[in-house]
Amino acid sequence: MRQFVVLGHDAPTTPDFPLDDLPGAAGRLDVLCRCVSAALFVSHGIRDDVEVFLVLGDEVTVRIDAGAVQYMHPDERNVAGLLKQALDAKTEAIGHQEASSSPGIHVSKRGFEAVLDAVSGPVVALHEDGDALAAVDPLADPVFVLSDHRDFTAAEASLLADASDHRVRVGPTVLHADHAITVAHNHLDTAGFDAY
């Protein structure tokens, strides 16, 4: 299982946002929607061995299980609509216990530290100052952690430094978060860029 933990610093934690202004009034939710699409979708299909954790404002987490998800399409508006439903179901979540809003989509009241404690597998921080991804052997069941359009806060960076097994960059140029996810998938799909 591949897991991606994406921190959404400005993302809404309530369902009170318009679907027609994801980059503005929805706090750059468009970035997170693109991350979900990059993590889950392939041409004409979906990866069923992926989980995505969207940590919103360090207080709410939406977990998407690609093996169980239904009704999701790769466009931002569709993904945002399902995230809106998840945030609406937040009242049913009890602490770290998840509530389901639709098949494969779960919401809980937990922040970054609790998510790091819950994931299993080697934690890989995706960061522009890390070692080259190509220099790291592909890992079994990795947990990739990355931030949205903002840098990790000092507190997040400290938690991640303690929890991570590797800190890597995906290339010499800083990429958007969703593009970094695509490169990470390619690294694993090709056994470290060796098998095509």
From Swiss-Prot:
Catalysed reaction, written as an equation: pseudouridine(54) in tRNA + S-adenosyl-L-methionine = N(1)-methylpseudouridine(54) in tRNA + S-adenosyl-L-homocysteine + H(+)
NCBIfam families: PRK02135.1 (NF002560)
This protein's encoding gene: trmY
Uppermost EC category: transferase
Record's subcellular location: Cytoplasm
InterPro entries, per database record: Alpha/beta_knot_MTases (IPR029028), TrmY (IPR007158), tRNA_m1G_MTases_N (IPR029026)
The keyword S-adenosyl-L-methionine is annotated on this UniProt entry: yes
Sites where the protein binds S-adenosyl-L-methionine: L126
Designated name of the protein: tRNA (pseudouridine(54)-N(1))-methyltransferase
Annotated organism of origin: Halobacterium salinarum (strain ATCC 700922 / JCM 11081 / NRC-1) (Halobacterium halobium)
Residues spanning the signal sequence: none
Keywords on record: Cytoplasm, Methyltransferase, S-adenosyl-L-methionine, Transferase, tRNA processing
Family: Belongs to the methyltransferase superfamily. TrmY family.
EC nos: 2.1.1.257
UniProt function note: Specifically catalyzes the N1-methylation of pseudouridine at position 54 (Psi54) in tRNAs.
Pfam families: Methyltrn_RNA_2 (PF04013)
UniProt keyword annotation of Amino-acid biosynthesis present: no
Single GO BP term: tRNA methylation
MF-aspect GO terms: S-adenosylmethionine-dependent methyltransferase activity; tRNA methyltransferase activity
Origin superkingdom: Archaea
